[in-house]
Amino acid sequence: MQESLVERHLKTRLESRGFKVLKLYTPGQIGSMDRLILRPTYWPGPPYFIEIKRPGKKPRPLQEARYNDWRARGVAVLAYVDSLEAVNQTVDMLFAASYDAYMRTTGMSL
């Protein structure tokens, strides 16, 4: 399976739940995350960064160092997804976290 299939699946699943998914281009900044994920406007919370890998591949040491640096600065970094199942788990987790934040701030359900 190609990385592009995992990437498309992530984008489709998140956008179907109201998230905005942006591809990042960071010239001169090796090791940056692939995607920026913005929550729906009515759900408060930080954006997330996520790395997409081919199945079975892991982030390079430079990428891990970059992720750790960003986390130390308070950035919400999701390590990486490398399969359709990992995408599904990540989307479910993001949706649940966003829904919980919505409930805490409004006291209302969707």
Task: Tell where the protein language model's regions lie, with residue ranges.
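Basic, glycine-rich
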Residues: 76-110
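Acidic-basic catalytic patches of nuclease active cores, encompassing PD-(D/E)XK
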Residues: 1-26
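Conserved catalytic cores of phosphodiester-cleaving nucleases, focusing on short active-site segments
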Residues: 35-37, 48-54
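Short amphipathic alpha-helical segments and helix-helix/interface helices
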Residues: 11, 64-68
